[in-house]
Amino acid sequence: MLPSNQAGVAGSGRGLGLARRAGNGAGCPGIRGPGGQYSGSSGSSESGEEEDPPGRGIKRGLNELELPEQGGAAGVVGYPGASGTVSGAKPGKKTRGRVKIKMEFIDNKLRRYTTFSKRKTGIMKKAYELSTLTGTQVLLLVASETGHVYTFATRKLQPMITSETGKALIQTCLNSPDSPPRSDPSTDQRMSATGFEETDLTYQVSESDSSGETKDSLKPAFTVTNLPGTSNIQTVPTTSTSMQVSSGHSFPITNYLAPVTSANGTVLKTEGGAMSSGGLMQIPAGFTLMSAGGAVAQQVPVQAIQVHSAAQASPSSDSSSELVQTSSSGTVTLPAAIMTSSVPTTVSGHMMYPSPHAVMYAPTQGLTDGGLAVLNAFSSAPQMQVSHTQEQGGVQQVFLTAPPGTVQIPVSAVQLHQMTVIGQQSSGSNLTELQVVNLDTSNSNKND
């Protein structure tokens, strides 16, 4: 019995867990055949030693696990210090799950690389799941010993790894020499798995962020519709333009400036839907609506607002042709969708539509009492073109042009104010009220 037993263990030198099994359990008491075998470690163990060569990893019988002293004494004769229990398990415990490994540096280079590859993939997956399930911002950076850097970042934190400043800071930190361990308790505590995690960094969360980036309530603010019976717009790709405006607590746009050369009109100032003057602001050949925000100078477009795409279904849209531009950064979103419709559309209690020579805006309840605002007048408008362009700087522009040419309206004389949408279900969106300031100082009908 003893020679057979020694022959079964010889050549291993690593204790019971790595002993070689001779035959079908012959020579080792307590070991049964293929049926009803138990392993000391499961296949999902993360110790980096799953790929064992043939002959390693002995499988022991159930009766040996129940009696570790007898099985151990008979199975490891000549090897003092080796026990019959599984490494990392309590005596007498039937281990079928993962084996706990020591939290220390792995000296074996192959095992270390295998562990890094598996655990790096796992922590990247966990970061993605955390950001997706909870809608939080996550930044993860893993630098390997071979000099490769792996990152995962959500939208708001991507500049940390994509901007030149962020990349330079990361390179500086990684290229700095590894400082010896210091006696700083805060540093040791941050590097510990059980240390404090919260930092002194904070940031403000808006309502749109807290409800999810993809679930912002997008309510239409105004609608441009072709009136039945008017045939001035003939070659237009869209006869109904619907633009949606959604904002959080504050709207950064403060002013729109009209060019001084277009001072042909009189005051058009709306206060609560009522008109204080009935004149027109004449803009030759068309106008340009430019998305802008922040602190701006005259004649200079700004770049704080991005226009996102938002598809909207309308029951009256027979043939819908949409022009969509998408951008990914900014603090305020102006989703814009363009669709065709053959009838006027009323959205949120307000309507905007073109007449043969002007684009008019009024609340629906103000149509009968004269509460009509003429926003733009064309000297001659046989056709009108709606187009979107986006330059490399990320500034979205919406052009409404007539054939003679295009006149840009930079930021100056049209003020935007917030107004709650009547009958709106969501409390996070606001309707923007448009005010046109008089540019003709000699007009006697001017009201402040």
Curated annotation (Swiss-Prot):
It is found in: Nucleus. Residues 24-38 have a biased composition (Gly residues). Residues 201-211 have a biased composition (Polar residues). The keyword Methyltransferase does not apply. Keywords: Activator, Developmental protein, DNA-binding, Nucleus, Transcription, Transcription regulation. Coiled coil: none annotated. One of its GO terms (biological process) is positive regulation of transcription by RNA polymerase II. GO terms for molecular function: DNA-binding transcription factor activity; DNA-binding transcription factor activity, RNA polymerase II-specific; protein dimerization activity; serum response element binding. This is Serum response factor.
